[in-house]
Amino acid sequence: MKTTVYLIRHSVRINTKNLIESWKTSQDKIVKSEKIILSVTGEKRAEILSNEEELQNIDVVYTSNCVRTLQTAKYLLEKQHLKANIDERFDEKRVGKPNDKEYPDWYTRQYEDENFKTEGGESQAEVRERVNEAFQEVVGQNKGKRIAIFTHDYAIMYFLLKWCKLEKVTPNREIKLSFKGKVVFDKRINSPEVFKLTLNDGNEIEEIENIPFDDLEFDDFNK
């Protein structure tokens, strides 16, 4: 019996630089990470996503601890009468201190060096370890089911690098991945973005696919 897992990046979030004038809160770090919400466009795109034929008949849903993933999932949850399982191990990478000046090549470097990180941040390897830990638990508890995991850009891409080969990464955030010699992704990651993983009876990944949707053209908060 095969298990199907959909790794789903959240929809378009707000651009805080454009919409927030000031921060008067003791929780600024949390507000800037976990509590970031979807944009108006992001809400519309999340609802469109919930109606895609590929994502019907889901058995179980997991989300990260961040508001924007739950906001993306809520349309699918309501439509299919499901409840979310929140797991912080699916959270986005902790970026750490701003690094553009000290590491102008930080975007490509974080993909090419799995141990690269800035002060207070996480490395590719660290993110992959926690995401994989959660993933293995999820598939172990839901064998043979159709699983949707709503998570984040880096969390997904770093996790996929456990099985995929990084063919290319560019400063303008274009990424090319291959699985078993076949290119499975070659573009910028969309908001939302969906990857379909098919696992065999032994919970080994047999196939990785990127699922495009014609009614969800590229959009992102930092496009």
What are these regions (language model features)?
Residues 4-8, 62, 142-151, 155:
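Beta-strand elements within well-structured catalytic alpha/beta cores of enzymes
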Residues 13, 155-156:
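Short active-site segment of divalent metal-dependent hydrolases/proteases
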Residues 14-18, 28-37, 77-133, 173-174, ...:
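Phosphate-handling substructures
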Residues 54-57, 138-145:
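Glycine-rich phosphate-binding loop signature in dinucleotide/nucleotide-binding domains
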Residues 65-69, 89, 151-155:
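Short, conserved alpha-helical segments within structured domains
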